[in-house]
């Protein structure tokens, strides 16, 4: 009798432990990438070679507005566009392309983008080829606070 009581007690405790444990999975949603703001170039590569020291990009500024307009300041270096206009990203959470349409044109120019986090700050990486497909530029932008 004691043996049956002992086994039934162990079985009851085991069942209580089994049914009391619930596994829940936290769903982590990818945040929307905030591309709006004023950006400055911190690194330039051409065909995977760092040419930052040879490019005068100190005054270059790219401002992406909340209203999907962009402005360029001191644009004296190769870039996708040469004048102000409107911009769009292909996906707010997982953007892979950034498109620019100058005000004085109906043509849209698109560059591939990445949004790496460096030192806890989201950066903007734009890859494009201005005219010559043999040359590929990568501009790493840092948001100006």
What is the meaning of each model-derived region?
Residues 22-82, 92-145:
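Lipid interaction determinants
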Residues 85-88:
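Short beta-strand-centered aromatic/proline hotspots
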Residues 17-20:
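C-terminal motif of bacterial Sec signal peptides marking the signal peptidase cleavage site
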Residues 1-9:
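Bacterial N-terminal signal peptides that target proteins for export
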